[in-house]
């Protein structure tokens, strides 16, 4: 539909490559390097917006709202290289040593800004995961990048929680039970657990007040570890709300660490005990 096409522009076609007739040797120079930098860059934009985007994010300030180390880790280009593609600048021809001027302007500013704005609006509209009338999922609009940034579809998350409940009847009715996702991708699995706990008759009986019940769930029942900084930001913003609407300052239990690496090193159990131990003991 038109919304999907518009959002897709933010992730797939927001980058406009300059197509000009040039000499063959020039095509083997700066243009090839530019295209190599741009390859896949557009697909990272929705992830950045999920993690760091706010109203007012534009092409002009895009490089300032994202930490430089995260920018390079996700896109494989530096912030300075992005600015070079956007603004242009001087560069030295590798073969001749001649200093040349690259004009930049590889991004259509109007399309970029409009697409970013529409994605932020869509993100806000789909942010309330407690609203079961929602038929769309914001992660349907976020293209996968690296292997550890492939997001679990919502229907799979629901099936996982259904299976868990089937194998352990009544697991969501005891306020002392704890649940963990030690390798979060989007935070969606945790949100499905939060919803089950929040609507549980057992939890409602223990915490009749909606806010107190949600605080208890977030502070004492759900735990998560995210492997990279951008995934941590995406997951925690999705779980707690992009403006902390869900969390509201509660003492949640989400950490940034690579659980896979910790498991390989044989230190995962010790890490979990160190960062979550006190809370797990209270549950």
Descriptions of predicted regions:
Residues 1-28:
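Accessory nucleic-acid engagement/destabilization modules that flank
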Residues 29-283:
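SAM-dependent methyltransferase catalytic region
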């Amino acid at each position: 539909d038109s919304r999907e096409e518009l959002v897709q522009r933010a992730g797939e076609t927001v980058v406009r490559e300059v197509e000009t007739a040039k000499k063959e040797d020039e095509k083997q120079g700066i243009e090839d390097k530019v295209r190599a930098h741009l390859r896949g860059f557009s697909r990272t934009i929705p992830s950045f917006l999920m993690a760091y985007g706010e109203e007012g994010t534009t092409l002009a300030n895009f490089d300032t709202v994202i930490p430089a180390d995260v920018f390079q880790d996700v896109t494989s280009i530096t912030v300075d290289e992005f600015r070079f593609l956007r603004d242009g600048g001087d560069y030295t021809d590798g073969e001749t040593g001649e200093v040349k001027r690259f004009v930049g302007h590889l991004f259509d500013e109007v399309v970029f800004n409009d697409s970013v704005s529409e994605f932020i609006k869509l993100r806000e509209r789909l942010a309330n995961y407690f609203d079961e009338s929602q038929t769309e999922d914001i992660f349907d609009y976020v293209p996968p990048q690296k292997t550890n940034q492939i997001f679990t579809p919502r229907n799979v998350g629901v099936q996982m929680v259904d299976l868990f409940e089937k194998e352990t009847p009544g697991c969501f009715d005891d306020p002392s039970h704890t649940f963990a996702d030690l390798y979060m991708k989007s935070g969606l699995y945790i949100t499905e657990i939060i919803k089950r706990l929040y609507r549980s008759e057992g939890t409602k009986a223990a915490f009749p007040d909606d806010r107190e019940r949600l605080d208890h769930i977030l502070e004492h029942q759900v735990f998560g570890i995210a492997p990279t900084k951008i995934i941590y930001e995406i997951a925690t913003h999705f779980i707690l709300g992009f403006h902390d609407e869900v969390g509201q300052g509660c003492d949640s239990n989400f950490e940034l660490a690579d659980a896979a690496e910790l498991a390989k090193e044989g230190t995962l159990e010790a890490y979990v005990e160190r960062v979550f131990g006190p809370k797990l003991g209270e549950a």
